[in-house]
Amino acid sequence: MAASGKTSKSASNHVIFKKISRDKSVTIYLGKRDYIDHVEQVEPVDGIVLVDPELVKGKKVYVSLTCAFRYGQEDIDVIGLSFRRDLYFSQVQVFPPVEAAGAPTKLQESLMKKLGGNTYPFLLTFPDYLPCSVMLQPAPQDMGKCCGVDFEVKAFARDSTEDEEDKVPKKSSVRLLIRKVQHAPSKMGPQPRAEAAWQFFMSDKPLHLAVSLSKEIYFHGEPITVTVTVTNNTEKTVKKIKALVEQVANVVLYSSDYYTKPVAQEETQEKVPPNSTLTTTLTLVPLLANNRERRGIALDGKIKHEDTNLASSTIIKEGIDRTVLGILVSYHIKVKLTVSGFLGELTSSEVATEVPFRLMHPQPEDPATAKESFQDANLVFEEFARQNLKDFAEEGKKDREAMDE
């Protein structure tokens, strides 16, 4: 994407995302695409709509926020549900103004100063019960939209006599996909640890396994060191130790399906003979880059292909109904031991235990710093890119068809 202006290299740039309707009657400006869910409250969507008064004469201009759950095509065939279910919709009229606007945010002040007249601020808020942006990755051969939760901000001009949004001419509307995301809490939980023991036939004493992690929360891309201690008091040999990061996606909105997918794994061929103890470490790095071809992996919602990653662990506010949260994501480390049998490989058995942890983004910069005064010279405008992903292919096709009309 090409910026529309240049700024001093010494000044920090504030990227402003803009998108203009096809008939150029309305243009929307947002300061960011990711809005943080702090569990107790969610950052509001604040922006500006630039209106061409001649082109919208006799019309009203609105901005709306929609949260939708999209079902995959396979889900429609199996359970007979519609393709999309709106979980939330809110709308505000920005032109003509219907009431005195509140104090503008720093972003809005700077944009109104930069853009001049015919600019109208808006503020859209999220209720605390909405899910975060998450989707289940389709396989490369899958066509159409995939299962997931997305958020859309829409600005549109509508005749005063029309009450239904679906009657809005596409040429007079503009849509932006945004994301609602969660970041790691400031306080970590206790150090994850699990122990398990198994009793085998013909062995008087058990096989004992202890697994521990150094902390409860890991950031995306951060190596996870797993400490494994095997105390083998049996007459059998532990032939292999394997550790996996497993992602569990619980689709709670229309069913209670669980999708458990390994997203990283490591193993050691170190053996633990009878009546001996071994302590070893295995390092795992769960990354989307190693799982791009795998169907059903939960991802943070997509805006651009390179912007996404494995879905972050879901944090649920106390008292919220889980069934409206779309897709809940959690992670655990599973450690498997392969134990020899009486007849060697033919009768080998596996035992395993799990340790939960959270995979998240680090806390962003201090909000007080992030909201420092926006200076005109630091505003860099970027056109909001059209979606070119499989899960948004249909919207792109519709947009292209509209452009050809």
Swiss-Prot record:
One Pfam assignment: Arrestin_N
GO biological process: G protein-coupled receptor internalization; signal transduction
Complex and partners: Monomer. Homodimer. Homotetramer. Interacts with RHO (via the phosphorylated C-terminus).
Residues modified to Phosphothreonine: 234
One example GO MF annotation: G protein-coupled receptor binding
Gene source species: Canis lupus familiaris (Dog)
Main function: Binds to photoactivated, phosphorylated RHO and terminates RHO signaling via G-proteins by competing with G-proteins for the same binding site on RHO. May play a role in preventing light-dependent degeneration of retinal photoreceptor cells.
Annotated domain remarks: The C-terminus interferes with binding to non-phosphorylated RHO. Interaction with phosphorylated RHO triggers displacement of the C-terminus and leads to a conformation change that mediates high-affinity RHO binding.
Subcellular location: Cell projection, Cilium, Photoreceptor outer segment; Membrane
Protein name, entry field: S-arrestin
Main localisation: other
Keywords: Cell projection, Membrane, Phosphoprotein
Family stated for the protein in its record: Belongs to the arrestin family.
GO CC field: membrane; photoreceptor inner segment; photoreceptor outer segment
Disease cited in the entry: Defects in SAG may be the cause of generalized progressive retinal atrophy (gPRA) in some breeds.
Membrane topology: Peripheral membrane protein
PANTHER family, per the entry: ARRESTIN, S-ARRESTIN
